[in-house]
Amino acid sequence: MGREQYNKIINNTKNTLDKSILEKITEFKYKELDGYYVIEVYIKSNVKAKEMGEIITNIEEYSKECGFNILVDFLRG
């Protein structure tokens, strides 16, 4: 997966997630680790498990539509 596909996935996430959830995300980063595509989602400390579930579902479902299997990693920051 290249930068263009990553940007497409993140833009979809920003356009489809509820604004109240997006406000709790500080940053997205992309890396490849041991052959896996990983999107790191940096979140504020007040994110609830349900909101994290919505983020991961949004990213994974759209990624699969684009033909990629993505791992989502949540980090505080």
Predicted regions and their residues:
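A short interface-forming secondary-structure element
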Residues: 29, 37-54
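Short edge beta-strands and adjacent turn/loop segments
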Residues: 19-39
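A short amphipathic beta-strand at an alpha->beta junction
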Residues: 63-77
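Ligand-binding pocket scaffold of soluble enzyme catalytic domains
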Residues: 16
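Short low-complexity stretches enriched in small and charged residues
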Residues: 1, 25-30, 70-71
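An amphipathic, aromatic/His-enriched active-site/gating alpha helix that lines ligand/cofactor pockets
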Residues: 51-64
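N-terminal presequence-like segments and adjacent domain-start helices
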Residues: 1-8
